[in-house]
């Protein structure tokens, strides 16, 4: 279920503070965050945000097409390597 339009999008306070500080200084640096549930807002466009996937931080460059999505959508947590091969010779 999607979030109600009467509510504002969720962005972690610490992440929002970092974005606003960089925007006022007009600097670009990698922002490290564990907040995968934060919604991407227009103030984040042009920044590189390193999102935690459970093991490491993946740097993601935010573009205008990502606005409205969650940060966690862009850093996959699972690494599917394929199903096990069916080796009939080893069974005999």
Swiss-Prot record:
SUPFAM superfamilies: Ribosomal protein S19
Pfam families attached to this UniProt entry: Ribosomal_S19
InterPro entries: Ribosomal_uS19, Ribosomal_uS19_bac-type, Ribosomal_uS19_CS, Ribosomal_uS19_SF
UniProt KW Ribonucleoprotein keyword: yes
Gene Ontology molecular functions: rRNA binding; structural constituent of ribosome
Compartments reported by the entry: Plastid, Chloroplast
Signal sequence, start to end: none
Gene Ontology terms describing biological process: ribosomal small subunit assembly; translation
Predominant localisation class: plastid
Keyword tags: Chloroplast, Plastid, Ribonucleoprotein, Ribosomal protein, RNA-binding, rRNA-binding
S-S pairs: none
One GO term describing the cellular component: mitochondrial small ribosomal subunit
Recorded family membership: Belongs to the universal ribosomal protein uS19 family.
Free-text function comment from the UniProt entry: Protein S19 forms a complex with S13 that binds strongly to the 16S ribosomal RNA.
Name of the protein: Small ribosomal subunit protein uS19c
Species whose genome carries this gene: Lotus japonicus (Lotus corniculatus var. japonicus)
Lineage of source species: Eukaryota, Viridiplantae, Streptophyta, Embryophyta, Tracheophyta
